[in-house]
């Protein structure tokens, strides 16, 4: 028993030595830095200037289609909305409403949106009766056209809507699908 305990101590020793040395080196480096350099910044209050909104779309790539025919959304469209960051998501959505003024690429006219959360479903249905409200729903996901925009399942059935961009930049839904489990109701 004594032999195995000694072997165990010997095995742990190099790690303890390394971590101990690493800690002392870091603390010495920190101590050598003059206090003024370490200050967090000036204490003067910042002037609050209204920054112009950035309304440029961050991505315009189309979703790639695999050989089996299944659509795959690009990375930029896979923003994860959970209950935790739902409020932030809606804030971003409303802030990006101005992005609708950006002209979509001429070769990309349609987009499938998939909503798995009933809150988003109701927002979409509300938007369908008011064309101006389409804008934030589209621009929220980086203005990605011809893509399947996926929201993770929170609860309820899946509502899909195919959106078409008209030449005058207005939008309209040209197809609807509602899926529950494996059944699709068109």
UniProtKB/Swiss-Prot annotation:
GO terms for biological process: DNA-templated transcription. Residues 1-62 are annotated as: Disordered. It comes from the Eukaryota. Induction: Up-regulated upon activation of cAMP signaling. Transmembrane segments: none annotated. Residues 18-40 have a biased composition (Basic and acidic residues). May play a role in cAMP-mediated gene transcription. This is Putative transcriptional regulator encoded by LINC00473. It comes from Homo sapiens. The gene is LINC00473.
């Amino acid at each position: 028993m004594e032999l195995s305990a000694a072997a165990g101590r010997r095995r742990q020793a190099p790690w303890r030595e390394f971590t101990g040395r690493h800690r002392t080196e870091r603390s010495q480096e920190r101590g050598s830095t003059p206090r003024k350099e370490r200050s967090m910044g000036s204490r003067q209050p910042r002037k609050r200037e209204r920054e112009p909104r950035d309304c440029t779309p961050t991505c315009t790539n189309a979703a790639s289609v695999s050989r089996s025919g299944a659509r795959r959304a690009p990375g930029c469209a896979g923003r994860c909305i959970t209950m935790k960051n739902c409020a932030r998501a809606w804030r971003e959505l409303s802030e990006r409403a101005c992005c609708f003024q950006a002209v979509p690429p001429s070769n990309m006219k349609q987009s499938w949106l998939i909503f798995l959360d009933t809150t988003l479903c109701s927002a979409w249905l509300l938007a369908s009766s008011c064309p101006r409200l389409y804008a934030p729903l589209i621009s929220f996901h980086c203005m990605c056209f011809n893509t399947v925009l996926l929201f993770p399942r929170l609860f309820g059935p899946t509502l899909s809507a195919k959106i078409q961009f008209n030449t005058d930049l207005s939008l309209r839904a040209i197809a609807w699908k509602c899926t529950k489990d494996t059944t699709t109701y068109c």
